């Protein structure tokens, strides 16, 4: 078989036929999109790239934020997807590993959409390419809709723990122990170190609470009163209303002035201030999911940092400042190990997905969802779209 020109790779294993073009949601200008019905398929940049036929996609805040702050005209949008493997790197089937990916496998992943250096690749399209070591295979119990809601949060929590300087070896050991205990709830106790998760009602906050419990930490969270019950059910030891004037002080008292680690899933001046107030007198580390306001660095004993999960690919991020980031090979190395560990959690069925709202209309309906998420109109749920439903029904 001859691969389409832009997909050629020596000895690549693929399904019998692939189209020469696809439908893809392209960025036209800041927060303006259109469906290109004749878009090229993504180029296989890495020697270990996998081509996936996308079935479901989910919307993340970064999809609208990046298209607003650093729009790349002609780039495919989207980060979270789930689909079916249709082409593999040449040496995959020769690997002795029984867990090696195979054509037809159901997978999910997080991709660099709106990429100035890879405009043909993004989740909001019929095909996407991702390095094989940065993919998760779906467990039998998981639907493609559910899977599409998980990758960005799962990848971001891992990167946040990496930037908190929690050793990977300790994560592997503790999570293995929790998996052996069947669930985070069965393994949970309140004797480990506290970690504050600010934004426990967000998708990433909910994921962080679960994984921190599995890793032997005691998560406490700042969230709205309407998110508190779910946060507790996911493993939070305590919740604190971020609207309270004493929120930071209350966290500090509850944690006996011992809190040393904080993950800020909101990352604005107010959230940073509360995190800094909550961290104990001995100081600690604060990691935000976005650039933090420098004026918020009011304690020398607290070391601040922020993550851009796109660094997991080991390539530069060429967005507008402050999101112009040189490649970070260490983040790629960590991510590959983290994905292996997270696969074990997925297989063990110890991760709960967010509440989903599955919408119809395919790619053409996605811009409306991006706008709703960007405007803060979507609360405590994830928007998911099945982009092949209309063709499947035809």
Curated annotation (Swiss-Prot):
CDD domains: enoyl_reductase_like (cd08249)
UniProt key word rRNA-binding: no
A single GO molecular function term of this UniProt record: oxidoreductase activity, acting on NAD(P)H
Pathway in which this enzyme or protein is active: Secondary metabolite biosynthesis
Family matches, as Pfam families: ADH_N, ADH_zinc_N
Residues binding substrate, per UniProt: 152-159, 309-313
Keyword terms: NADP, Oxidoreductase
Positions annotated to bind NADP(+): 62-65, 224-227, 242, 289-290, 378-379
E.C. no: 1.-.-.-
Biological role stated in the UniProt entry: Trans-enoyl reductase; part of the gene cluster that mediates the biosynthesis of fumosorinone, a 2-pyridone alkaloid that acts as an inhibitor of protein tyrosine phosphatase 1B which is implicated asa negative regulator of insulin receptor signaling and a potential drug target for the treatment of type II diabetes and other associated metabolic syndromes. The polyketide-amino acid backbone of fumosorinone is first assembled by the PKS-NRPS hybrid fumoS.
Subunit structure: Monomer.
Alphabetized PANTHER family for the sequence: HYPOTHETICAL OXIDOREDUCTASE (EUROFUNG) (PTHR45348), TRANS-ENOYL REDUCTASE APDC (PTHR45348:SF6)
Family (UniProt): Belongs to the zinc-containing alcohol dehydrogenase family.
Name of the protein in question: Trans-enoyl reductase fumoC
């Amino acid at each position: 078989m001859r691969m389409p020109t832009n997909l050629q790779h020596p000895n690549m294993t693929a399904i019998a036929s692939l189209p020469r073009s696809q439908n893809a949601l392209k960025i036209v200008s800041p927060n303006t999109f259109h469906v290109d019905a004749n878009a090229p398929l993504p180029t296989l940049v890495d020697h270990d790239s996998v081509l996936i036929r996308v079935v479901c996609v989910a919307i993340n805040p970064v999809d609208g934020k990046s298209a607003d702050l650093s729009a790349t005209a002609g780039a495919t949008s989207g980060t979270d997807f789930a689909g079916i493997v249709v082409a593999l790197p040449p040496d995959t089937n020769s690997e002795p590993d029984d867990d090696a990916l195979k054509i037809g496998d159901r997978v999910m992943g997080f991709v660099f959409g709106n990429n100035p250096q890879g405009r043909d690749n993004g989740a909001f399209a019929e095909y996407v390419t991702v390095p094989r070591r940065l993919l998760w295979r779906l467990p039998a119990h998981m639907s493609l809709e559910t899977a599409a809601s998980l990758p960005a949060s799962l990848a971001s929590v891992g990167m946040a723990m990496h930037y908190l300087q929690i050793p990977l070896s300790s994560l592997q050991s503790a999570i293995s122990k929790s998996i052996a205990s069947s669930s985070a709830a069965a393994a949970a106790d309140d004797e480990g170190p506290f970690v504050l998760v600010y934004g426990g009602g967000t998708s990433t906050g909910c994921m962080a609470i679960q994984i921190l419990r599995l890793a032997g930490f005691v998560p406490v969270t700042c969230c709205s009163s309407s998110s508190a019950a779910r946060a507790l059910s996911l493993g939070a030891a305590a919740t604190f209303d971020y609207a309270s004037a004493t929120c930071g002080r209350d966290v500090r008292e509850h944690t006996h002035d011992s809190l040393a680690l904080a993950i800020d899933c909101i990352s604005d001046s107010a959230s940073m201030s509360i995190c800094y107030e909550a961290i104990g007198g001995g100081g600690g580390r604060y990691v935000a999911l976005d650039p933090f306001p420098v004026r918020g660095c009011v304690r020398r004993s607290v070391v601040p940092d922020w993550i851009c999960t796109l660094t997991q690919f080991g390539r530069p991020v060429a967005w507008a400042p402050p999101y112009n980031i040189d490649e970070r090979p260490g983040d790629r190395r960590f991510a590959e190990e983290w994905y292996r560990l997270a696969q074990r959690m997925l297989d063990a069925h110890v991760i709960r997905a967010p509440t989903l709202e599955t919408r119809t209309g395919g790619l053409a309906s996605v811009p409306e969802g991006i706008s709703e998420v960007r405007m803060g109109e979507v609360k405590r749920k994830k928007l998911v779209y099945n982009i092949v439903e209309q063709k499947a029904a035809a």
